[in-house]
């Protein structure tokens, strides 16, 4: 499947990196983003491994990675990552 990040998800990645640099330093922020990239590849390769959450307005799949969650859907032959949010945020409102 093709992995596609929405503009909002790309913005989330930039924000995660900036916040990581501020809190933990650039080297650690880069490592975290590399690990997050591996999780995104997993989601792209095995999207069906993540349970569909149908309790929301629109059913989505939610995959946890450390402090963050990857919110995505399968659309045709694409895995579309809508957002990458911190697990403590009110991400259900978006």
Question: Language-model features: where?
Answer:
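Arg/Lys-rich, positively charged N-terminal/basic patches that mediate binding to nucleic acids
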Residues: 1-31
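Short proline/glycine- and basic residue-enriched helix-capping loop/turn segments at helix->loop/beta transitions
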Residues: 44-45
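Amphipathic alpha-helical segments that line or abut small-molecule/effector binding pockets
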Residues: 34
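Enriched for short, Lys/Arg-rich terminal
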Residues: 67-94
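Basic/aromatic recognition patch in beta-strand/loop cores that engages polyanionic ligands
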Residues: 48-77
């Amino acid at each position: 499947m093709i992995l596609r990040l929405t503009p909002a998800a790309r913005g989330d990645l930039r924000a995660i990196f900036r916040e990581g640099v501020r809190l933990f330093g650039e080297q650690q922020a880069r490592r975290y983003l590399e690990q997050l990239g591996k999780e995104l590849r997993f989601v792209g390769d095995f999207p069906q491994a993540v349970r569909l959450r149908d309790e929301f307005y629109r059913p989505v799949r939610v995959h946890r990675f450390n402090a963050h969650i990857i919110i995505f859907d399968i659309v045709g032959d694409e895995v579309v990552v809508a957002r990458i949010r911190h697990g403590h945020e009110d991400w259900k409102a978006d």
